[in-house]
């Protein structure tokens, strides 16, 4: 299973990413890093820097990744 975490570089999002990865889940993170920090993103997560309001950007991530579920922070 692959879960997309929107806002996965923020405090709550990054902790969620760590918990998911510890459970063996494949994680993809999108964050614009306005309030999040790249250092907070788990090294096993695939990270995309961008704004979720940019439909073309989000579509490109969804085209590239096989996402089963989304968590939005």
What is each stretch, according to the model?
Residues 1-73:
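N-terminal Rossmann-like NAD(P)+-binding domain of SDR-like oxidoreductases, especially those catalyzing
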């Amino acid at each position: 299973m692959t879960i997309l975490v929107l806002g996965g570089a923020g405090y709550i999002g990054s902790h969620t990413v760590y918990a998911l990865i510890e459970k063996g889940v494949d994680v993809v993170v999108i964050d614009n890093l306005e309030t999040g920090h790249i250092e907070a993103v788990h090294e096993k997560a695939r990270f995309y820097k961008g704004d979720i309001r940019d439909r073309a950007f989000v579509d490109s991530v969804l085209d590239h990744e096989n996402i089963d579920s989304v968590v939005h922070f």
